[in-house]
Curated annotation (Swiss-Prot):
One of its GO terms (cellular component) is phycobilisome. Belongs to the phycobiliprotein family. Gene3D superfamilies: Phycocyanins (1.10.490.20). (2R,3E)-phycocyanobilin binds at residue 81. It is a peripheral membrane protein. Contains one covalently linked bilin chromophore. The lineage of its organism: Eukaryota, Rhodophyta, Bangiophyceae, Cyanidiales, Cyanidiaceae. The keyword Thylakoid applies. This is Allophycocyanin alpha-B chain. It is found in: Plastid, Chloroplast thylakoid membrane. The gene is apcD. Keywords: Antenna complex, Bile pigment, Chloroplast, Chromophore, Electron transport, Membrane, Methylation, Photosynthesis, Phycobilisome, Plastid, Thylakoid, Transport. One of its GO terms (biological process) is photosynthesis. Transmembrane segments: none annotated.
């Protein structure tokens, strides 16, 4: 659910108009729409470079993952790892435009711990991988304002995987 929808539903649940504070928050959100779109376009257009930088960093931190018997030792396993990077980056862009963590939570995090555990993927590696993805993605953004729009959603994914 988008930030706008959530705000409206909360007010309607209380059978009231949006108050002044809510309207100001909505104004700020709507005024940030161009920046949000710019951030999403940057992340989308630079996806390959972001994933490449993030994976290099992850495999520096955990060289055993690409060593014999590691979770990303073969080309197929490595391709799946890179696919997951792209998947999380895309889901984070959904949350950026919505102004809400719900898209990444609902689509990307429900049941993720169980799934990775069942596949034998170390959760610490997933936490580190999203941290590397965050670092690579935020490095592509041009301003602190853009970073502030994207960073909370990366942090949300990291925190949820770390629990």
């Amino acid at each position: 659910m988008s930030f706008v929808s959530k705000t409206i539903i909360e007010a309607d649940h209380e059978l009231r108009y949006l108050n002044g504070a809510e309207l100001e928050i909505l104004r700020a959100y709507l005024n940030s729409s161009e920046k949000r779109i710019k951030v999403i376009k940057t992340l989308r257009d630079r996806e390959k470079e972001i994933i490449s930088k993030a994976s290099r960093k992850l495999f520096q931190i955990h060289p055993d993952y690409i060593g014999p018997g590691g979770n990303a030792s073969g080309s197929r396993q490595r391709a799946l790892c890179l696919r997951d990077y792209g998947w999380y980056l895309r889901l984070i862009t959904y949350s950026i435009i919505a102004g809400d963590k719900n898209p990444v939570e609902r689509i990307g995090l429900l049941g993720v711990r169980d799934m990775y555990n069942s596949l034998g993927v170390p959760l610490i590696g997933m936490v580190d991988s999203i941290q590397c993805l965050k670092d690579a993605a935020l490095a592509e953004l041009k301003s602190e304002e853009e970073v502030k729009l994207a960073e909370p959603y990366f942090d949300f994914v990291i925190q949820n995987m770390a629990q």
